[in-house]
Amino acid sequence: MTKKLNLLHLAICILLSIGAGLLIRSIYHGDWFEFAGFVTGVVGVYLVAVEHIINWPVGLLNVAIYGYVFFSSRLFADMSLQFFFFALGVQGWWMWARGGPNRTELKITRIPILWWVGIVVALVLGTAIYYPVIEHFNGAAPFLDSLLTVASIIAQLLLNAKKLENWIIWIVVDIVYIPLYISRNLQSTAFLYSILLLIAISGLVNWMKTYKVLEA
């Protein structure tokens, strides 16, 4: 079952994101690709926060746009991350559409505590593997780029499975990405991640409320 979408709230989100994107573009002279990435990014994450399946096609469009933006800024790990995100976006769309057992709605669940050990190990190993690759291609910030790439992939996998903790990882990732993008003169993207941070916090609160209702 697809969550009912509040069209008024969606329209407000779209209009505000377009207005903010145009304002930032006029101030920092960003290009139209970054503007389009900004708008689709805000709208896409809003749709995730309210658990609506249409977030996936919007997210796939956002991934394609930012693949080009990051390539232009020499953030090669972030560029390559978009390929992972596209594949994971297709998987997530399929998982949410298929649902749980007997094609019921996929429910929000939590990960066991021991999963955090595996997540930390995956972060360390993934960063260690990715770092020399990004450094070889003269990436702008190889360590942070690699660490955030691996963390984002983990968060996306948890999101696909509707694990509540995906929002915790996204919140940390967004906080670190903001100064990184400012340092690369991607002010619109940095502002986008500031908004995504707020939406991620809202998403965590919203999903927590839904989870408590399901567990009651």
What are these regions (language model features)?
Residues 48-95:
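Hydrophobic/aromatic-rich structural module bridging two neighboring secondary-structure elements via a short loop
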Residues 20-32, 49-51, 71-72:
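Short, hydrophobic transmembrane alpha-helix segments
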Residues 8-20, 37, 121-122:
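Alpha-helical transmembrane segments
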Residues 46-58, 157-169:
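Membrane-helix interface "capping/anchor" motifs
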Residues 159, 163-216:
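C-terminal transmembrane-bundle signature of multipass membrane proteins
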Residues 1-14, 111-117:
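N-terminal membrane topogenic signal
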Residues 28, 68-78, 132-139, 182-187:
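Helix-coil boundary and interhelical linker segments in multi-pass alpha-helical membrane proteins
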Residues 80-95, 111-132, 151-158:
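Alpha-helical transmembrane segments of multi-pass integral membrane proteins
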